[in-house]
Amino acid sequence: MKSRGREMFKVGPIGSQRAYLKNLEWEEKGRNMISSIYVAFDKDTINSIQFSYCQNGGHVVSKKYGMSDAQKQKYGSYNGRFHVMFVFALVTDDHVKTNLCNIQVRLNDDEFVTGLSAIYLCKGITNLNIHTNQGKHGPICDRYSSSKNIMDNYKVEIDVKIRDRREFGGFFGSFDNYGTLTSIGIYVCPITRINDVALRTNYKVTDDYDDQSTFYQSSGPLTTINHNRKLEYQMPHEVSDVKPIVHNPNFEDKISLYQSSDRLARSTNTRTLEYQIPEFLDVNPIGRKSKLKYGIFSKLARLFRNLLD
């Protein structure tokens, strides 16, 4: 996986370039799916480094940085010793295979680089450790582990708290013209996580122009603003802390025509009146009583009076 479209920056390096020698700078950046790291070394220094990546279901090998075997046999080292590469295999654990002067650090599929540590002295980088999310590989070219004084005073570690594979951007460093690794560092490619919060607020964005209060005011934050100035939303974990906004109407509830012992109308949050159906047990209707039977007899009486007349 390549780190495209994201800015990377250097962290380190451990060590430095030598002003009195020709320095060969190198870098291997932009890919974070490292499957193996190959390192060649003698008893004093690290002489070359190479990387293998997972790509499209296969493996791609990078350029080999440092002095090649042919160059070492031709020119030797700066102190006059030749670099002889042995081929006797020694298996130390499930991740590392050693040929005495050649080492392969093999990473698991879900493993990625998080940092480095090493010792830098006048002869170059030694005691190199590759730190990952699953542990540590090394030390490579272990010369000073038994010296507490050197370990305490000259060991340098790069740890930028990488927690995501995408944050690792690659390696960089330098070799001198004798094939000695004089410096090494890493590239970091920051990404924004939801939990990387610079500011929290109790407001929720409802449109593109105005930030409005949420209808339910919660005691926990509903919105977070990340480093890209984009809003990320969090759902409330508990409903019990939600307090609804209740509207108190400014007008009085009117009593209906039927006089009941209970209130028949009540106000709601939407400023409307809701009426309850009255129970007629205690209702006294307003109006005259029916005079139907008295009207019939009066008509009959008038009829008889007319007949008699």
UniProtKB/Swiss-Prot annotation:
Recorded superkingdom: Eukaryota
Jacalin-type lectin domain residues: 8-190
Similarity annotation: Belongs to the jacalin lectin family.
GO molecular function annotations of the record: carbohydrate binding
InterPro entries: Jacalin-like_lectin_dom, Jacalin-like_lectin_dom_sf
Protein name in UniProt: Jacalin-related lectin 25
Keywords: Lectin
The keyword Cell inner membrane appears for this protein: no
